[in-house]
């Protein structure tokens, strides 16, 4: 059976650079060629972030490549895109990012019932020693798994 929410595009650096505190699902306002390009995995969330402007959420810095079969009415690659969310959730996000050290970052773009959704997160930036500790922990876990596997044979 196919996964309901398989990610079309994911921000793989997010979990390395940030500590994820809470995630939300949002809709996104897109043009037709943008949707087709995202379905072809033609988008990146590398330098993207979410900003609250006039009590609305905006995805800034998301690069969606031109649709290769598009015509002269193709979309602009690096435009700001509006995110759709309930007002109480927007207020919660706005309050969280006003707190020192917290940010709103996009984690993934995925399909849900034929519509493209954005998974965003309230996150706290990691310091370099936190990143090193995470890498060491992951390395230790991997070595333990390999040792257990060797013991079984």
Curated annotation (Swiss-Prot):
Keywords: Cytoplasm, RNA-binding. Residues 144-153 have a biased composition (Low complexity). Residues 133-143 have a biased composition (Basic and acidic residues). It is found in: Cytoplasm. Pfam families: SmpB. GO terms for molecular function: RNA binding. Gene3D superfamilies: 2.40.280.10. One of its GO terms (biological process) is trans-translation. One of its GO terms (cellular component) is cytosol. Residues 133-153 are annotated as: Disordered. NCBIfam families: PRK05422.1 (NF003843), smpB (TIGR00086). HAMAP family: SmpB (MF_00023). Required for rescue of stalled ribosomes mediated by trans-translation. Binds to transfer-messenger RNA (tmRNA), required for stable association of tmRNA with ribosomes. tmRNA and SmpB together mimic tRNA shape, replacing the anticodon stem-loop with SmpB. tmRNA is encoded by the ssrA gene; the 2 termini fold to resemble tRNA(Ala) and it encodes a 'tag peptide', a short internal open reading frame. During trans-translation Ala-aminoacylated tmRNA acts like a tRNA, entering the A-site of stalled ribosomes, displacing the stalled mRNA. PANTHER family: SSRA-BINDING PROTEIN (PTHR30308:SF2), TMRNA-BINDING COMPONENT OF TRANS-TRANSLATION TAGGING COMPLEX (PTHR30308). This is SsrA-binding protein. It comes from Protochlamydia amoebophila (strain UWE25).
